[in-house]
């Protein structure tokens, strides 16, 4: 019989994703077959699975922690916001349709069936399923038809741990308030609390823990310390910028679109010792960069208009006049062409708009969505290097610019470059995950003697470090008595 434990949080970014990853790694190295599961995820950072679908990147990292390949059953419902009130709905890894919030609310009963189908399939394959909730279970306006938090826990009858982030303050109010807002049956299934990101002397916290346990009649199952410089992929929030400590560095700037997607593409750059990396927000300038990267977006036309409203198109033109380099990824590639056509109204009311015009091709948005994991060779310097990545897009780009490709995948060309070699563009995400490719791209951008950073190995090290910390401060055998050592 499969053991299921659900992690819910008092807020978004309380530490749910991280704790699930830690538990998956701890159990996996005990020889237990464990899988992560998130019924519903709302995120613009996604991953392509081996079965050809799309899930949240958080679940992909959790699968890595568990030592298994990511699968669409680990995140059966993925919502990718495209406007303030609407999102693309991904079911079992495939795009279903764009829905407004009220339409999705009506769809939840159907969505719950998809969630349960995936969960039951995982039950047949794994000894333990560690489930991650979404946001907070105490959102009163979202309680009806809930499939992401207590609605799921009640349906499958699983115990729940509630985690809260003490570093942000108000941890006792968050925990007590969340518990108070749950129904009686939901309160009963809460087996305890975890306090995350604690700094300082634990002795000073103990009176508060005693009060919390007496107030709620729930145990504190662990206090996870603030883990300095823990580098795992961020699912939602943009992570902090970095500044290179090396005297020789490359200044890379990335404009933050309103619907920026897959910003985890840049995590390896943030950690590279020779890169001065920064996201550039509204009202900030792109000037002074060596390399400007135009990232992916869930709404290319809207974010192209946003780019122009910020004056970034003018700054990009100046950057190129002075010899700067530009890389366009996915939606960023589409912006660099001469025109974008949306005849089916996929991103916006049916229309055509002018692109930035730096590369000779046009993009037409189609109802078919490309989802691919890829390996190939990057051809931007004298010597081709191995590269891996993935595609997630709903556009078809064609034109003379693609006669100058930058990647070959199984003999097929991909991407394009300008005649003067200042601009390159590709649909591939994950360009910087492979050390040789990162080294080549930084060299193309002007960094001599660029070092190789093995990002995949770094994530493995970080997952192990995280698991070690969590295992020291939580009684894992008590949580999973069936598998106690």
Curated annotation (Swiss-Prot):
GO terms for molecular function: ABC-type vitamin B12 transporter activity; catalytic activity. This is Cobyric acid synthase. The lineage of its organism: Bacteria, Pseudomonadati, Pseudomonadota, Gammaproteobacteria, Cellvibrionales. Pfam families: CbiA, GATase_3. GO terms for biological process: cobalamin biosynthetic process. Belongs to the CobB/CobQ family. CobQ subfamily. Residues 249-437 form the GATase cobBQ-type domain. Pathway: Cofactor biosynthesis; adenosylcobalamin biosynthesis. The keyword Transmembrane does not apply. The gene is cobQ. PANTHER family: COBYRIC ACID SYNTHASE (PTHR21343:SF1), DETHIOBIOTIN SYNTHETASE (PTHR21343). Catalyzes amidations at positions B, D, E, and G on adenosylcobyrinic A,C-diamide. NH(2) groups are provided by glutamine, and one molecule of ATP is hydrogenolyzed for each amidation. Keywords: Cobalamin biosynthesis, Glutamine amidotransferase. The active site is at 330 (nucleophile), 429.
């Amino acid at each position: 019989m499969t053991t299921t434990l659900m992690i819910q949080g008092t807020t978004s970014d309380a530490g749910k994703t991280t704790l699930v990853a830690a538990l998956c790694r701890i159990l996996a190295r005990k020889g237990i077959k464990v899988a992560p599961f998130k019924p519903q995820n709302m995120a613009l950072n996604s991953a392509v699975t081996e079965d050809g679908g799309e899930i949240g990147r958080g679940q992909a990292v959790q699968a890595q922690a568990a030592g298994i390949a990511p699968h669409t059953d680990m995140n059966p419902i993925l919502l990718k916001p495209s406007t303030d009130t609407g999102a693309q709905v991904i079911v079992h890894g495939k795009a279903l349709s764009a829905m407004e919030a009220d339409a999705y609310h009506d769809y939840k009963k159907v969505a719950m069936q998809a969630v349960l189908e995936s969960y039951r399939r995982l039950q047949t394959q794994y000894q333990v399923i560690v489930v991650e909730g979404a946001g907070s279970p105490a959102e009163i306006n979202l309680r009806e038809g809930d499939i992401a938090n207590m609605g799921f826990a009640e349906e499958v009858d699983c115990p729940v741990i509630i985690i809260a982030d003490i570093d942000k303050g108000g941890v006792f109010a968050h925990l007590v308030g969340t518990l108070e807002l749950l129904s009686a049956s939901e309160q009963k299934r809460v087996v305890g609390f975890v306090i995350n990101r604690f700094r300082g002397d634990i002795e000073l916290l103990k009176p508060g823990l005693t009060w919390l346990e007496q107030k709620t009649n729930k145990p504190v199952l662990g206090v996870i310390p603030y883990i300095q410089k823990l580098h795992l992929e961020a699912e939602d929030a943009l992570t902090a910028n970095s500044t290179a400590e090396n005297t020789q560095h490359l200044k890379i700037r990335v404009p933050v679109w309103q619907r920026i997607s897959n910003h985890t593409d840049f995590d390896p750059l943030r950690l590279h010792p020779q890169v001065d990396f920064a996201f550039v927000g509204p009202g900030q300038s792109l000037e002074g960069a060596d390399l400007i990267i135009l990232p992916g977006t869930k709404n290319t036309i809207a974010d192209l208009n946003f780019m122009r409203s910020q004056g970034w198109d003018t700054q990009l033109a100046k950057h190129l006049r002075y010899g700067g380099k530009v890389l366009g990824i996915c939606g960023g590639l589409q912006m660099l062409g001469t025109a974008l056509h949306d005849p089916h109204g996929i991103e916006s009311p049916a229309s055509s708009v002018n692109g930035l015009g730096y590369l000779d091709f046009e993009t037409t948005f189609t109802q078919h969505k490309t989802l691919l994991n890829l390996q190939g060779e990057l051809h931007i310097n004298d010597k081709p290097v191995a590269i891996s990545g993935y595609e997630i897009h709903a556009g078809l780009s064609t034109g003379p610019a693609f006669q100058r490709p930058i990647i070959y995948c199984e003999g097929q060309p991909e991407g394009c470059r300008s005649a003067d070699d200042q601009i390159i563009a590709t649909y591939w995400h994950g360009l910087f995950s492979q050390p040789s490719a990162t080294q080549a791209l930084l060299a193309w951008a002007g960094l001599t003697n660029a070092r190789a950073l093995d990002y995949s190995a770094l994530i493995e090290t970080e997952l192990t470090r995280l698991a070690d910390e969590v295992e020291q401060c939580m009684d894992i055998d008590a949580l999973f008595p069936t598998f106690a050592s």
